[in-house]
């Protein structure tokens, strides 16, 4: 009888642990996932996947998101690193055809997007490693392309957003919009 009671008790505890663990997976994220897709030309598909942090009354540029590379920390193996251009997992861009960004060719594929902000021009990095958490393990040797762009002042945007504008038959401007800045980069066929 003791053995049977112990088995029932252990089964009950395991069920509680399983239910609790399962419930953890369904928590609402602080920075919700989002995605935006644009077609250009006959069949070029561009998709940006990202997570959307909120301003929440904070100063973003030069504070929450530092200018230049972020200082080394315990997650980055003592190395400085660029901003992940969003929150949580890497922000990614996926293109199905060759395009030009900043006059340079980017082959078809899926790339992580990282940025190095400054008070004037920003560097946007398209990196071949598209499956990591943030930019902590960013490796410059895996860069597919780096372009320099100039951010522009914009209306206040609480949640980080990527979108497309200035759409033509052979080009589009993709941009990040957050706080009071837009960071545009033109994509040409």
Question: What does each model-found stretch correspond to?
Answer:
Residues 24-107, 112-189:
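Targeting-peptide/extracellular-domain and disordered-appendage signature
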Residues 1-25:
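Bacterial Sec-dependent N-terminal signal peptides
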């Amino acid at each position: 009888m003791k053995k049977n009671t112990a088995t029932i008790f252990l089964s009950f505890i395991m069920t509680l642990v399983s239910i609790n663990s399962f419930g953890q997976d369904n928590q609402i994220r602080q920075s919700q996932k989002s995605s935006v897709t644009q077609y250009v030309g006959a069949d070029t598909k561009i998709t940006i996947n990202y997570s959307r942090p909120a301003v929440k009354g904070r100063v973003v540029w030069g504070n929450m998101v530092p200018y230049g590379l972020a200082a080394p920390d315990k997650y980055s193996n003592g190395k400085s690193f660029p901003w992940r251009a969003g929150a949580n997992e890497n922000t990614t861009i996926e293109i199905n055809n060759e395009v030009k960004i900043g006059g340079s060719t980017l082959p078809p594929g899926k790339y992580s997007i990282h940025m190095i902000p400054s008070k004037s021009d920003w560097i946007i990095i398209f990196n071949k490693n598209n499956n990591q958490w943030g930019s902590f393990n960013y490796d410059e040797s895996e860069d597919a392309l780096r372009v320099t762009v100039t951010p522009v002042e914009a209306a206040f945007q609480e949640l980080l957003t990527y979108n497309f504008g200035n759409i033509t038959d052979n080009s589009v401007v993709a941009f990040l919009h957050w706080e009071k800045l837009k960071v545009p980069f033109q994509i040409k066929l």
